[in-house]
Structure formats: C-alpha cells, structure tokens
C-alpha cells in the first residue's frame, strides 16, 4: 500500500505542476495538498474514522481536477472521475472504497452540508474540513494574499473589509446570489474567516478556532495601523 500511495503522490505532483493549472497553482499546489492530507489524517484519527489510508488517498487527489477544467467550480466533479479511474487502474482499493473517494472529491467544493449525524464523520466531511483548515491561520492568510494579489488591499473607508463579521451562512447566500465574495484582499480574508462556520467535526473546529481568531486580530491591527497613518497624514 505504501507503494500505491507513492504512485498517487507522484501523479498529483506531476499534474498540479502542469502549466495548464495556471494561476490556481499559486494557492493549490502540492504543498496545499500535503497540508490538507496532514489535516485530514489528524481529523480522521481523532474522530475514529476507520481507514486512514483511504483518507490519505482522497486528500492527495482532491484537487487533481484543477488541471482539466476552465471553470474552477467544476474541478470537484471532474477530479472525482479522474481519481476514480486512476484508483481502479492502480487496484489498491475495493470499488466501494473508490466510490467513497469519488464522492468526497466531488463534494469537497460544493455548498456547505448540513451537520452530520452523530458518530464518526464520513470521508466527505473529513476532506471538506481539512481543506477548509488550510484557509485559516497564517498559512491561510498567505494563500489568500497570494491568490488575490491583483485586488486592492482594502476599502479606503473600512480597512478591515466590507465583509467583516460575515457569517458562513451569509457567505453562502452571497455566493448563491452570484455576488462577489471578495473585491479586496481584506475581504478575501473575511471570506476565509467565514468558512470556519462551515466546519463540521469537533476536531476541526477546535483546531480552527485559534487560527481564525488570529486572522481577526490581524485585520484589526491592519486597520489600526492604516488609520493611525491616515490621521498623521502619512497615507
């Protein structure tokens, strides 16, 4: 099985390094995938999910569809097909396990799910939570800034962002209404902060709480520094 996971890792490294991934590779490179694998394994172990090898495979493959789509919103469904075909060819999992991986990849970037039933979370919930954790904390901040570097830094009259304090539910409503989630970098950060509300496992919420608190402190400090300089006539 170790060799099979190495084969999966090699495929993902090669695929995400392909030029067709384009600018999405700034925040969705193999480093991101590896961090998601780390979080997914940590969540799965804490939440008593029975198959850590399956978790590792799903995490490694979750963004593979990015190399095959123009519309990023389709990368989950396209990636599920690619992952399923590769795993069947590899022959390392039973078909019912591969279906679980396909479902998790297909759903990992879908709208938020309702809270799961009591008991161990399914693979989809683990993968979604792990992917969300990589939006939070200092790593999430760097990913957000790097991926949205062409945007203005912040709104002039509200440095911490127009979306400051937005909830996960409100964010989902904005997306469903076709409204932009970020027109400035600070609102990209607010978008990522709001994603914390969509974490479903107790483990992920415990891990994410201090990370998202730090992001809020960062925005408050940014606003304080900018306002001080504005009052002094330096900006």
Predicted regions: what they are:
Residues 49-60, 95-104, 122-126:
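Alpha-helical scaffolds flanking conserved acidic
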Residues 12, 40-43, 83, 105, ...:
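Hydrophobic alpha-helical packing residues
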Residues 78-84, 90-107, 115-121:
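Helix-adjacent hinge/juxtasegments
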Residues 11-14, 58, 100-108, 148:
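Short acidic/histidine-centered micro-motifs embedded in hydrophobic/aromatic stretches
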Residues 22-48, 61, 112-235:
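Divalent metal-dependent phosphate-bond-processing catalytic cores, especially two-metal-ion Mg2+/Mn2+ enzymes
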Residues 1-78, 88:
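Acidic/His-rich, divalent-metal-binding segments that scaffold phosphate/diphosphate chemistry
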Residues 3, 7-11, 97-100, 104, ...:
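Exposed alpha-helical structural elements
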Residues 63-64, 107-111:
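A short structural micro-motif
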């Amino acid at each position: 099985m170790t060799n099979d996971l190495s084969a999966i890792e090699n495929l993902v490294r090669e695929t995400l390094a392909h030029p067709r991934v384009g600018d999405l590779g700034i925040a969705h490179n193999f480093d991101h995938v590896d961090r998601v694998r780390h979080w997914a394994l940590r969540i799965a172990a804490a939440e008593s999910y029975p198959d850590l090898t399956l978790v590792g495979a799903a995490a490694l493959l979750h963004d593979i569809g990015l190399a095959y789509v123009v519309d990023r919103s389709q990368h989950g469904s396209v990636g599920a097909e690619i992952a399923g075909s590769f795993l069947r060819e590899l022959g390392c999992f039973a078909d019912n396990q591969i279906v679980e991986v396909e479902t998790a990849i297909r759903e990992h970037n879908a709208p938020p799910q309702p809270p799961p039933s009591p008991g161990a979370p399914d693979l989809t919930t683990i993968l979604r939570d792990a992917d969300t954790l990589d939006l939070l904390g200092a790593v999430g901040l760097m990913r957000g800034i790097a991926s949205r570097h062409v945007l203005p830094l912040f709104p002039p009259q509200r440095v911490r962002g127009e979306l400051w304090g937005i909830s996960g539910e409100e964010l989902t409503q904005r997306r469903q209404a076709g409204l932009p989630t970020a027109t400035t970098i600070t609102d990209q950060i607010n978008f990522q902060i709001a994603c914390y509300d969509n974490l479903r496992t107790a483990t992920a919420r415990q891990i994410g709480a201090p990370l998202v608190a730090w992001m809020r402190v960062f925005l408050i400090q940014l606003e304080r520094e900018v306002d001080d300089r504005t009052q002094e006539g330096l900006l």
